[in-house]
A protein has these predicted regions:
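Short glycine-aspartate micro-motif
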Residues: 4-8, 15, 114
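Glycine-rich phosphate-binding loops at beta-strand->alpha-helix junctions
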Residues: 107-127
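Glycine-rich phosphate-binding/hydrolytic loop that grips phosphoryl groups
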Residues: 125-126, 135-172
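A glycine- and small-aliphatic-rich helix-loop capping segment at beta-alpha/alpha-beta transitions
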Residues: 19-25, 29, 126-132, 155-157
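Adenine-nucleotide phosphate-binding core of ATP-dependent small-molecule kinases
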Residues: 55-109
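Glycine-rich phosphate-binding loop plus the immediately following alpha-helix
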Residues: 1-4, 12, 20-77
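Conserved active-site and cofactor/substrate-binding residues in soluble primary-metabolism enzymes
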Residues: 40-44, 80-83, 87-94, 122, ...
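Fold-independent oxyanion-binding glycine-rich loops
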Residues: 7-10, 27-29, 92, 118
Length: 172
């Protein structure tokens, strides 16, 4: 596919949009949606960082759906776990919907939609319901496979990957 959106929703949420085979935009966890463990800084966290009570990285690693409540996946009840995955699905859908608006400006009216990350298969149905479109979960090793394919392209002399130039120092 030349037009697609991938949202990696797990410990944090990162979404990338590709139009005509080129990266059109990306949303990273520190500025938008929290994942299960990490997330954007709220006003209280920003104040604590400004007061030098914690670093921005510490605030980010405590800003997730579960960590804000002092929970872990292993240490929460089934009800808490379901609520966390529901929230994760909502945040992933929100980022995908936002990226879809950007891709429309790049003539990608109906990009394919994918979810990555360990919870992908668990939340894909809910994200599909929220968006009114099919969102396909990727297998857990697909990100590693994608990295290997990019490395192979660079090794073979690719000058760009998805529209981003390859540093001349690493080209063959």
């Amino acid at each position: 596919k030349k037009d697609f959106i991938i949202s990696d929703a797990s410990s944090n949420v990162v979404t990338i949009g590709v139009a005509a085979g080129r990266i059109a935009g990306a949303i990273d966890a520190p500025i938008f949606a929290p994942g299960l463990l990490h997330g954007p800084l709220d006003v209280a966290a920003i104040r604590r960082v400004d007061a030098r009570e914690m670093t921005a990285n510490e605030a980010f690693t405590r800003g997730g759906i579960l960590r804000k409540r002092g929970l872990t996946l292993k240490g929460c009840t089934e009800e808490e776990k379901e609520a966390a995955f529901e929230a994760l699905a909502l945040y992933a859908a929100m980022e995908i919907a936002a990226m879809a608006v950007l891709l429309r400006d790049h003539a990608a009216a109906k990009p394919a939609l994918y979810l990555a990350g360990d919870p992908a298969s668990r939340i894909a149905g809910r994200v599909s319901d929220l968006l009114g479109r099919e969102v396909l979960p990727l297998a857990s090793c697909d990100a590693a496979l994608g990295c290997a394919l990019i490395a192979e392209d660079v090794y073979k002399g690719a000058r760009e990957v998805l529209g981003i130039g390859v540093d001349g120092r690493v080209r063959g």
